[in-house]
Amino acid sequence: EPNVQFRDVSIAYRSVKGDDRLVFDGLDLEIRRGEKIALIGSNGAGKSTLMKLMVGLLKPGTGDILLNGESTRKKKTEQLSKSISLVYQNPEEMFIKDSIRADIAYAMQVRDVENWQARTDELLARFRLTELQDRDGRLLSGGQMRRASLAIGVALNPGILLLDEPTANLDIATRKEIMRTLTDMKDITETVMIATHDMQLVCEWAQRIVVLCRGRVVADGTRDEIFGNQEILDTVGIRPPEIFSMGQALDSRAFCYT
């Protein structure tokens, strides 16, 4: 049974002109336990909206979203946060306290999680933040902010972790570091979904790629099925990553690895 099911979901935003802008119109999508999924598509395709719907920050206008077979329509974000966590594109939005330690501990404290102090120590060590634990997260480097935001995101042991543009605005070395971290998440969370424009990250990391365009899923498949289909790429205006093109040229798939 899928972790999450979108059933005929529609949602619209009220524009500055006062009219409704339809983001999704009858969206159907299933997310299965244990998957590593990448959402791709042009700006405005609905990637961030889909994630906000999953964590309850937005509610569908029509249709429903099921979590483990149960409707989430009447559930609050706080109720869903034990199962699904969203790490924002801008890590600064994850920092609400004056130290990383306090930020990581906060969600556990307000929910009376047992052994929250030990869990905080564990996450600080796991994401190499122990020496930075008393620092204000907003004053860290880009890579340190990313690691801290991931630690906050997994504090409640969510079964599903959503990451919005996890490698945006990072230098090459920091980007590689975050990619290694994403690859090594199996013991922390079962299912990971990213929304990204980083096609190399998609090629190297994702098992499944969902392509969004104008509020619809226009393609859903493996790396080879998506990046090897020029019609799909043209539809959403993206180019296959160089690493995939090299693999095709050499008739080898070893360049795209998990």
Where are these regions (language model features)?
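Conserved ABC ATPase "signature" region
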Residues: 114-132
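The feature captures the beta-strand-to-loop junction immediately N-terminal to the Walker
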Residues: 40-42
